[in-house]
């Protein structure tokens, strides 16, 4: 149960961190943490990594 709670709060923190990295136009800047399933990187960038990664130039 404690492991689940830790995972839950880690996920919550990650979501909050993600939203602070998003610029006004709604895209993630270079080297921002991103999810490969929900790629919101700015133009000419792609989320590189396995499941989670960083926005890098294409």
UniProtKB/Swiss-Prot annotation:
Source species: Cotesia flavipes (Parasitic wasp)
A single cellular component GO annotation: extracellular region
Lineage: Eukaryota, Metazoa, Ecdysozoa, Arthropoda, Hexapoda
Domain statement: The presence of a 'disulfide through disulfide knot' structurally defines this protein as a knottin.
UniProt name for this protein: Teratocyte protein CftICK-III
Cystine crosslinks: 27-42, 34-47, 41-55
Remaining remarks: Negative results: does not influence host total hemocyte count. Does not influence hemocyte spread index in the host. Has no effect on humoral immune system, since it does not influence the activities of prophenoloxidase and phenoloxidase in the hemolymph of larval Diatraea saccharalis.
Keywords attached to this entry: Disulfide bond, Secreted, Signal
Tissue-by-tissue expression: Abundantly expressed by teratocytes, which are extra-embryonic cells released by parasitoid wasps into their hosts during larval eclosion.
Record's function text: This endoparasitoid wasp peptide has immununosuppressive and insecticidal activities. Suppress cellular immunity which is detectable as a reduction of hemocyte encapsulation in the host. In vivo, ingestion of this peptide (probably at excessive doses) increases larval mortality and reduces leaf consumption in both lepidopteran species D.saccharalis and S.frugiperda, which are permissive and non-permissive hosts for C.flavipes, respectively.
Residues annotated as signal peptide: 1-24
Places the protein is found: Secreted
Transmembrane regions listed in the UniProt entry: none
